[in-house]
């Protein structure tokens, strides 16, 4: 077994001062039966813990590290920016530069506002939609996670699903009553809800590729129906591309699936590994935001120069690499092909999903299209798989509800080693 002695001690010390010993619940390795590795450093496709174990990393800081950890150009840009100061609390030219870059990649984002987290982005986008429409209700999809804002912690996936508590204590009934929930990938139920409530719904928010019930792409016609119904009822369609943005394709899910939303939320990659996110969309909606309009939103560190610099450099590096999307998608497909072959050989039912460079697996015999399907996957087999992979120095997300990520830094050798490890791990899963 892998030696996590120092990590165990660090975890015990952390629990004295932080809830669960972590600053985000899933990091505590719930139900995995081992302490979380405490990280010392990371470089490229590898991450090293305080016990000296080095792993091939498919978590990628949960998505941002698309170029790999500590990319030299990104680090150099951050260092140069830090020498000028870490924060100003005032406008800078680089904020306009990143806004222009994002608009170039996402033409549907005519104006945007920088914030510090995906949660801030989704909360602010919903407030803008309510202000723009004058309506109160919103509609989300079961199993889709949009951060920890009160109105969105209703049947959420990801960390909430891991803990078996899709609704959070502390969220008032008054807040929850304005949030409608529809099954992801169910066209008929959504259309019925819109027929009944559409004229009172300010916004429909969706992960166009669900990334918090593991990785679940949309079925044919689902996103098209969302677009048609929201247009019919004057409802704002918000794509939460905090996770799938720049991943499912460089131009996002809206380009891959040819759907133009009214608003988009971005995060993770646009901060280059530092805290940054953004929300934006149609000019007439964004003109409702203060100081131009009456919808208030602000932030001391919004547009922080270090995060914006890291984001600009990350986007420029991605743009400079020919066929960037194709390279990552091919690597991901190769890895999943190897995992599927290993599962078949071990007699383990396995469903593999991929959208660009985000991917996931389900220990299940039937196709996974929504949150209930994801919940039916074999949790015991996942645990056996996860622990075996960790023991072989493969760093995966410690929950069957989390998506995995490929980076440009992953080499053919990394993928070969990971497939080799998967053969042993699938044998362990078969015995679970």
Predicted regions mapped to residue ranges:
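Conserved N-terminal phosphate-binding loop of PLP-dependent enzymes in the Aspartate aminotransferase
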Residues: 1-432
